[in-house]
């Protein structure tokens, strides 16, 4: 067994990233291996582990583990409204997500700690002629913890296939903001780029720290099978944003009161809210 294989076996999130998509019905047609380099090979099995802990005057990035092409360097404190908040930028050394990539991320916010995690720029899923790319994200937010996970938009290139699975484990007193923004593609790059990807599959689940399920949502987009411009789907819009807020009820009610539902097709703005705790 190689050193990489041993590390993968010893890291549950990496095991899941390599298995994700193998039995997914939406990816059944895309199980062929890339000719250039097999899926999940060295340089194509990325991993990030970030653990945040509370100290006297601020929270810190207490532990970090990284495997190419995933990279994090250090936490910065640039949020003037929350000066104790460590802000971490995730970087891809390959520049984009490629066919055969298997990516995993573990973020752990300890009791009373806080963290903001984002990306250096939009995440581009490169066009593919074999296989697919997969991603596992696992977040743990302990008692009184606060996590903002707000990456820049994801841009799927034409003929790309991407599957992502996210699990948020959270204490009832903690708060987590999770965001994913999906673009229609490189709209002005090529005539076939707008909704030219093959598959985008996303599953997000939340549970308490004992493993009790809070919610699960999954959507699979296959624009070559069914148009995404239909009413009730994208309806001519080019960006889809999904923001999930998990927070105690006293915060939840005040936030909902300030975020009304809104629809403006001329202005290109549609905002829906789900009033659930």
Swiss-Prot record:
Instruction: State the source organism's domain of life.
Output: Bacteria
Q: Which InterPro entries match?
A: UreD (IPR002669)
- NAD as a keyword of this entry, yes or no, is no
Q: Where does the protein principally reside?
A: cytoplasm
Subcellular location, record wording: Cytoplasm
Q: Name one GO molecular function term.
A: nickel cation binding
Is Nuclease one of the keywords? no
Keyword tags:
Chaperone, Cytoplasm, Nickel insertion
One Gene Ontology cellular component annotation held by this UniProt entry: cytoplasm
Q: Short name of one Pfam family for this protein?
A: UreD
Role according to the record:
Required for maturation of urease via the functional incorporation of the urease nickel metallocenter.
Q: How does it assemble?
A: UreD, UreF and UreG form a complex that acts as a GTP-hydrolysis-dependent molecular chaperone, activating the urease apoprotein by helping to assemble the nickel containing metallocenter of UreC. The UreE protein probably delivers the nickel.
What family name appears in the similarity comment?
Belongs to the UreD family.
Recorded hits in PANTHER family, A to Z, give: UREASE ACCESSORY PROTEIN D
* Name recorded for this polypeptide: Putative urease accessory protein UreD
Species the sequence originates in: Yersinia pestis
Coding gene? ureD
